[in-house]
Amino acid sequence: MGSMNAILQTFEFWQDRRMPYVETRRSCFGRTCYKSHSHPTFSIGAIDEGNSVFQSSFGTAQKITAGTLVIVPAHVEHSCNPMPNQAWSYQMLHLDLAWLNQLYSEFQEQGLDLHIPQDRK
C-alpha cells in the first residue's frame, strides 16, 4: 500500500438528470475521516483498495478491506473511515428511497419473485 501514500486524494461525484434517483461517489487514495452520519438514500459501498473501519447503529466497529461490499439502509447512522495513517479507495452508490420503494411496488404488482436466486446445483 506504500504506492497509495504518494498519490493525491481525489473525489468524484456522478449524477445524470435523466436518472435523478441515483448518485455515485468515488474517493481515491482518501484519508479524510467523517463523523457518524446518515443518508436519506439506500447506499451500497465497495472498498477498492486499503482498509477501513465501518461502524453503524447495527453493531460494533468492524475492520473492512478491499473487496468488501457494505450496504447501509436509508437513515441508518454510520461511519466508515480509513485506518490511521493509511489511505483507501472506495465507491458509493446512493439510490433514492422513494424510487426504490416504487420499483419494489411495481415488481410486487407484476408478481415478480423478489427473492435472491439460489444456485441450483
Task: List the model feature ranges, each with a label.
Residues 11-114:
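N-terminal regulatory/effector-sensing and dimerization cores
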Residues 114-121:
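Short, intrinsically disordered, charge-balanced linker/junction segments flanking boundaries
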